[in-house]
């Protein structure tokens, strides 16, 4: 059962202290730091003492679902792409525009010197990827991710796949580097679990993976999470939302979202129309092209078709296959296509009439198996549902984040050319939405997650006039797939 709304069991902190600071103080009492840099939960965190609980609301004096009148942000746009680590995309950023970015270590000649051991005693240095297809797949399964993290040593990547040590730079990703050098970049945004796409996206939609550790389409038929999803709260408290779909909606990875809210799914073309007209809903999930999701009878594909009245995009009607045109940034895809998609979405928001009232968060679901050097912190368990581990799975729980990923907040109120070192994960998006519309927390994780306050400065509208960003590299649809 949920905690009674408004119930507080936190530390006695003055009300004037910002929520982000309060959470940091609480978490400091609940964690300790090991010599390796891996943050480990203490008994206090294990018993959830001094933590906000599911059902907690941030403002007991404001109606549930009522927008915060103090905030100029009335629209949140979420653009979550696929499978890249911070260092793979932004390891070179300290030498290419943002010296405060926590990227690679460099020698006196400016060359990155981060490395990982290889079998046989040699070491693999990080190296520049010389073509736009980002494969081969480096390995982001539950077991591989735990091996890569290796207790916080972050030295297991190359042994699994040497190509995991590759990186891109500003010449490859001019638009992404322009985003990071213009707005506020997260130095400490971690995926929510050391696992693949499905569990990490469940955290974005429900604050928990509730047992899932892998990308398995059969999990679509799992029961809904115990406290529902943020989409259920949108419906209950009259917060408007849409999932703007190119071919497949990732929000439907929790099947109850599509089953319970079919009218909130619409086409990607409608996003651009709504952004231009100033008719975006309160919350928008903007989906790039997946390009593959199984076979022609995929259950998610069939549900999408039914929910959209048989009018799903042509890509969904076709038998599914890896497409040269996929723009979700999945490894093996042409990174120029993903960059072009994000550029279109960001520019649509910036040129629309609601720019001054919109917050866009661009981020990645997980690291795709690619190297990152920052030790992974411990995390608050979202609930009492453990991972559904098989006989060969490495023991572990949801009390640890996954590998660090890129994240930038784009807003007229974003701090200019800044970084935040606050620890965030995907439930920080949930926390920000809960903060803006005073929604009950779904799990312990989102109840205690840092929101997006540290990216923003509401004292100064830094970008009242939208900035001009670098154009993405043009893509010639280079074939990145052979199947």
Name each region found by the language model.
Residues 1-22:
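N-terminal secretory signal peptides that target proteins for export/translocation
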Residues 2, 22-26, 75, 404:
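Basic side chains
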Residues 45-483:
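N-terminal pro-sequences and low-complexity stem/linker regions of secreted or lumenal proteins
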Residues 16-46:
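Secretory targeting and sorting signals
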Residues 11-13, 23-26, 365, 370:
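Short amphipathic alpha-helical "recognition" segments used for binding
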């Amino acid at each position: 059962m949920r905690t009674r709304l408004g119930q507080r069991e936190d530390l006695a902190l003055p009300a004037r202290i910002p929520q982000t600071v309060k959470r940091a103080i609480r978490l400091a009492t609940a964690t300790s730091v090991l010599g390796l840099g891996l943050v480990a939960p203490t008994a206090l965190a294990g018993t959830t003492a001094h933590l906000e609980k599911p059902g907690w609301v941030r403002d007991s004096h404001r109606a549930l679902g009522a927008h915060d009148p103090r905030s100029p942000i009335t629209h949140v746009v979420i653009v979550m792409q696929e499978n890249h680590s911070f260092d793979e995309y932004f390891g070179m950023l300290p030498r290419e525009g943002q010296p405060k970015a926590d990227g690679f270590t460099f020698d006196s000649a400016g060359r990155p010197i981060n490395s990982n051991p290889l079998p046989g005693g040699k070491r693999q240095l990080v190296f520049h990827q010389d073509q736009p297809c980002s494969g081969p797949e480096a390995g982001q399964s539950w077991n591989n991710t735990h091996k890569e993290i290796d207790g916080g040593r972050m030295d297991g990547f190359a042994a699994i796949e040497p190509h995991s040590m590759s990186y891109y730079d500003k010449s490859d990703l001019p638009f992404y580097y322009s985003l990071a050098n213009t707005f506020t970049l997260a130095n400490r945004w971690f995926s929510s679990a050391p696992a693949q796409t499905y569990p990490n996206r469940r955290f974005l939609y429900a604050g928990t993976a509730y047992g899932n550790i892998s990308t398995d389409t059969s999990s679509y038929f799992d029961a809904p999470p115990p406290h529902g999803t943020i989409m259920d709260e949108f419906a209950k408290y009259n917060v408007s939302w849409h999932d703007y779909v190119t071919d497949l909606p990732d929000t439907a990875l929790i099947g109850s979202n599509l089953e319970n809210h079919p009218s909130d799914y619409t086409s990607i073309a409608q996003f651009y129309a709504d952004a231009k007209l100033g008719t975006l809903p309160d919350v928008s999930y903007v989906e790039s092209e997946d390009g593959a999701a199984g076979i022609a009878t995929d259950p998610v594909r069939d549900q999408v078709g039914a929910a959209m009245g048989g009018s799903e995009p042509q890509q969904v009607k076709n038998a599914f296959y890896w497409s040269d045109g996929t723009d979700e940034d999945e490894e093996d895809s042409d990174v120029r296509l993903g960059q072009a998609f994000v550029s279109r979405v960001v520019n649509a928001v910036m040129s629309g009439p609601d720019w001054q009232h919109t917050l866009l968060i661009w981020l990645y679901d997980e690291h795709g198996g690619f190297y990152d050097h920052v030790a992974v912190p411990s995390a608050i368990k979202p609930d009492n549902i453990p991972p559904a581990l098989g006989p060969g799975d490495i023991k572990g729980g949801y009390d640890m984040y996954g590998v660090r990923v890129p994240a930038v907040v784009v807003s007229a109120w974003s701090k200019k050319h800044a970084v935040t070192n606050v620890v965030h994960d995907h439930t920080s998006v949930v926390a920000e939405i809960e903060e803006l519309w005073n929604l009950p927390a779904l799990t312990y994780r989102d109840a205690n997650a840092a929101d997006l306050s540290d990216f923003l400065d509401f004292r100064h509208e830094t970008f009242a006039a939208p900035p001009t960003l670098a154009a993405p590299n043009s893509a010639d649809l280079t074939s990145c797939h052979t199947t």
